[in-house]
């Protein structure tokens, strides 16, 4: 078995005068070609254009050659698809004398058509959601998250808006109050003691003098008027009522003791007079 593999498109007989001359020409021609697995050298022009070689070397033969029953590989099919237009142009222009000029435009158009067909095939296999819709969804999600971050950026831990100056200034442990709600020295759940101005205390005392229990509507009005919260108004009135009860108890106890002392004094005076 010879180590030379005959190409499927290579002609069976070579041109030459007579049978002996043809065999001698074939041997001399085959001796000039190095033995590769594909039949041609890597840079040989006949390796890339087998049909042109068949036209060039099969012009003088009278016998009709038949193609080998070997199946074409994937690379040969790709080459046939890409250079089919070039081979057709070579046969039409050159005829039996040789291959025509290389038509790069036709080959490039065929390659582009094959790439477009492959792209459309794989695109049909993918999900119906297009790339533009996916990017639009991601962009909307990013904008929504940015809006949430921007809305929370200007609020403190309790939801109250804070100034840019306060947020930029660092707060150290020695700067915090002793009884702050999140201070270093105080307990974690302890709140700071609320201080009221003289004006606020005076207005609250006036309201307590007329009404010891406030309705929800009146509490809201006082809170807006004194720049306080409803919770602060409610706590102040609770503390004030407890203080008032203690004062009443002291007054009642003192009055009862005084009345009892007066009764006892009158009885003693009556006994002395008798």
From Swiss-Prot:
Q: Could you list the residue ranges that cross the membrane?
A: none
Any Gene Ontology CC annotation: nucleus
Region annotation (Disordered) ranges: 248-274
> Motif Antp-type hexapeptide in this chain: where?
171-176
Q: Which UniProt keywords apply?
A: Developmental protein, DNA-binding, Homeobox, Nucleus, Transcription, Transcription regulation
Q: What GO biological process terms does the UniProt entry carry, in alphabetical order?
A: anterior/posterior pattern specification
Q: Short name of one Pfam family for this protein?
A: Homeodomain
**InterPro entries, from UniProt?**
Antp_homeobox, HD, HD_metazoa, Homeobox_antennapedia, Homeobox_Antennapedia_CS, Homeobox_CS, Homeodomain-like_sf
Report the Gene3D superfamilies cross-referenced here: Homeodomain-like (1.10.10.60)
**DNA-binding span(s):** 189-248
Record's subcellular location? Nucleus
Q: Which GO terms label this protein's molecular function in UniProt?
A: DNA-binding transcription factor activity, RNA polymerase II-specific; RNA polymerase II cis-regulatory region sequence-specific DNA binding
Q: Which domain of life is it from?
A: Eukaryota
Assigned protein family: Belongs to the Antp homeobox family.
What the protein does comes down to: Sequence-specific transcription factor which is part of a developmental regulatory system that provides cells with specific positional identities on the anterior-posterior axis.
Q: What is this protein called?
A: Homeobox protein Hox-B6a
Q: By which gene is this protein encoded?
A: hoxb6a
